[in-house]
Structure formats: C-alpha cells, structure tokens
Amino acid sequence: MGYIKFKQEKGLKIMTSININKEKFGQLIHKEKLVLVDFWAPWCGYCRRIGAAYEKISEEYSDILIAGKVNIDEEPQIAEAEKIEIIPTLVLYRDGKAIDSIVAPESKKMIENFINEALEK
C-alpha cells in the first residue's frame, strides 16, 4: 500500500492519506475502523481543489476512520465495481460495505457533516 506524504515545513502539519490500489481495496474496507475513500482523477480540477480539505479531514478524523484515495484512471475496475459515475465521490465504508456517499462536496464542512451524519445512522 503506498502512502502520499507531505513534508512538514514552518509549523505545517504532515498530512497523509493512503493511495489505494486494486490489491489493497478489499482488504482496506474490511478494517475495524470506518474507511473514507475519495474517488478522484488527476485531470479533475474540482478533485484537486477539494483535495486539501480531504487531507485535513484524513488527519483530523484519524482516530475514527482511515482515509484513502482511488485514482480512477489507475484503478478503473474499482470505480466500475463501486458504480462511481461522477468524481469526486467520497464513499464511507463499514465492515466492507458502503454505508453512505457524497458527490462533489463543496467544502471541508460538507465533508465533516457527511461523516457525522453517517456515524449517527
């Protein structure tokens, strides 16, 4: 499983998210923690724009969930199997099953609300 890491400079926090491939997807979503997966592509401007908020969420919620990213260009079979038609799409998994999803969240607050509402279900 690969990791994307950003260097810490001048008080900035290190942000880490898991880069998910086909071999690791099934294993990851069956973890005991909740798993939040961002389906995205590098050519998607909106995906890149919301990426910083997603990285902050992955750090702030690391005690309750694992955050990962699936590049649909590199892993189209995962996107197809999960019926991802629009990007960015965030999917929350529990015990190997998708429990909720959100398409094109507009802000970090929207992602937080999505997670909190899903946790209440």
Specify the residue positions occupied by each region the protein language model found:
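Short, Lys/Arg-enriched N-terminal segments with co-localized hydrophobic residues
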Residues: 1-14
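Non-catalytic, surface beta->alpha helical segment in thiol-disulfide oxidoreductase systems
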Residues: 86, 94-121
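A short beta-strand-turn-helix
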Residues: 17-34
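Short pre-active-site segment immediately N-terminal to redox-active cysteine/selenocysteine motifs
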Residues: 33, 40-43, 86
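ABC family nucleotide-binding domain
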Residues: 38, 51, 62, 81-84
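Conserved redox-active cysteine motifs that mediate thiol-disulfide chemistry
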Residues: 39-53
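Conserved helix-turn-beta segment immediately C-terminal to the redox Cys motif
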Residues: 32-34, 51-70
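Structural micro-motif
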Residues: 76, 82-91
